[in-house]
Amino acid sequence: MKIRSVDATWLRVPIPEGRQHTSDFGRMRSFDTVLVRVETDSGLVGHGEAKAGVGNLGDGRALVTLIRDELGKQLIGRDAARIAGHWEEMYNGSRAHFAVERGHVFPALGRRGLTISGISGIDIALWDILGLSLGKPIWQLLGGKCRDDLAAYASGGWAPAAGIGEQLAGYVEDGGFGAVKMRVGSADGDTLISAQRVEAAR
């Protein structure tokens, strides 16, 4: 089962103005992601997802080019089931032989940030292909189920000190969450403001 093609598409979904929010990363005006598509010579197609920036911010064009023209081209004609080996080679580039010979990773420069995001999208697509080829869900391939349910927390908490307590309590009361994560940091503009918001939340 050889890899025939690797492609990527930037998806941008505008967020209605009333549902936008501002974080440390800026105003969230759209949800951006890159859809990765890996096709094999057997006809199986796997899909993955990669992010161009933290908090869904960022232009997806560079990530699409990276996946399609650099990372993806390394994989054409290769065995789609050799997932760990492909990850190692994409991450370490021309230095992959060090990892194979010595048994440990040998990171090359420039293999973080955007590159690791691109690798992740391809990696997900390859796992998708493996699952399809075996007729198994990916969670089984990764070791199986550990529990029947998983606790979730609410993420948000952007309100100023005067309203943060009410906002966080709403997540618990209205959403049924047992825990919440509030945001503090550069969006506050001053660490004193962050401290006041945290104190008010308590």
Spans of model-derived segments:
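Metal-dependent enolase-superfamily TIM-barrel catalytic cores that perform enediolate-based chemistry
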Residues: 143, 148-202
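Structured beta-strand/loop patches that form or line metal/cofactor-binding pockets in enzymes
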Residues: 1-55
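A short alpha-helix capping/helix-coil boundary motif
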Residues: 14, 104-108, 146-149
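Metal- or metallocofactor-binding catalytic centers and their adjacent structured scaffolds
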Residues: 5, 39-133
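Conserved active-site and cofactor/substrate-binding residues in soluble primary-metabolism enzymes
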Residues: 30-31, 62, 66, 81, ...
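A short, structure-level motif marking secondary-structure boundaries and short turns
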Residues: 22, 111-113, 152-154
